[in-house]
Regions:
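Rossmann-like adenosine-cofactor binding region
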Residues: 4-102
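C-terminal helix-to-coil terminal segments
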Residues: 96-152
Length: 152
């Protein structure tokens, strides 16, 4: 996280300065990060090798349902082959869709999931768009805007 949180009973980390400490306490890494210059390639061999080996499998697991640009495919496959990574569940890739010949399809310790969002209810979407239009007409700012400088 960019911003420190205080949650009872939970160790919280923030910023690049605490990334290695976070990784050292993490045996299952779940990435739901947006695609930004800061997150490009963050799931790489260095990151994998900093993860805890204290979990139930003796090697870490990664789950990426964020963006494909975050992961370095060759590093993940090499770490799996070397036993440095117990498994990977991947929902996103570069390129998408994942090519039929990719080793991710056949690697015994990789689970590939379809990158699909939930079904959208047209009535709910229309009501939300109408709400945003009403805000705009009233001189209020739109809600839930993307911060283009941050990329999410």
């Amino acid at each position: 996280s960019r911003t420190r949180k205080e949650l009872p009973g939970i160790d919280c980390y923030a910023g690049a300065a605490e990334f290695d400490a976070f990784l050292a306490r993490t045996d299952i890494l779940v990435s739901l990060l947006p695609a930004t210059p800061e997150t490009d390639g963050v799931i790489n061999r260095r990151t994998i090798n900093k993860l805890s080996r204290e979990g139930p499998f003796g090697a870490p697991i990664i789950i990426n349902a964020g963006r494909g640009r975050q992961q370095v495919a060759e590093d993940i496959l090499a770490a799996l082959d070397a036993g440095e990574l117990h498994g990977a569940t991947l929902d996103v890739f570069v390129p998408e869709p994942l090519p039929p010949g990719s080793r991710f399809w056949t690697h015994p310790r990789v689970t590939v999931t379809p990158h699909t969002a939930a079904d959208s209810d047209p009535e709910v979407i229309c009501a939300y768009v109408a709400h945003q239009i009403a805000r705009h007409r009233s001189g209020l700012a739109f809600e839930n805007l993307v911060d283009k400088a941050r990329g999410y």
